Design a protein with these regions (language model features):
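Extended beta-strand/beta-hairpin segments
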Residues: 1-54, 65-151
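Alpha-helical metal-binding/catalytic segments enriched in His/Glu/Asp
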Residues: 59
Length: 151
């Protein structure tokens, strides 16, 4: 296999079509459509910078859930809050991103959650790896014991 073939095998192409009013209809490499643009009256979709926060949350969330399932943790609810702080001058990049994982379940081991978050942040989440090259990312978690009958 040549070097160019190896690179081409990993190439992903997203296509965006201008839809007017500073909005774009984007098609992901997997064929899903998303509307994005600049926040102003009449646009009811996430901005490109908001999509970065969503991408980070989705990426790390999938990792954490998968790891906790492998560790046989009984998670009944899981929420991620991603908070981004942007600098004032252009380009208005995120300078700090906080990721808060809220895990609820039965006898969930906080050490298992801490390890799952750490593995996602340092090994598995590609979005985190991309963003952490120029942005401070701080992760934390909370475990809430589920009460009542097991589902």
């Amino acid at each position: 296999m040549t070097m160019s073939t190896e690179i081409a095998a990993e190439l992903k192409i997203a296509r965006l079509r201008y839809a007017g009013n500073e909005a774009f209809v984007a098609e992901s490499p997997s064929g899903h459509a998303v509307v994005t643009g600049f926040a102003h009256e009449g646009l009811s979709s996430p901005t490109p910078m908001e999509l970065l926060l969503i991408a980070l949350g989705g990426c790390t969330g999938a990792d954490v859930v998968g790891i906790l399932e492998k560790k046989r943790q009984v998670v009944t609810s899981y929420e991620i809050e991603v908070r981004g702080t942007r600098r004032a001058e252009h380009p208005r990049i995120y300078t700090r991103i906080e990721v808060v994982h809220r895990v609820q379940g039965r006898n969930v081991d906080p050490k298992a959650v801490a390890r799952a978050v750490e593995l996602s942040e340092t090994k598995y989440c590609s979005v985190s790896a991309m963003l952490s090259a120029g942005t401070e990312i701080v992760s934390s978690f909370e475990v809430v014991e589920e009460e009542g009958p097991r589902i």
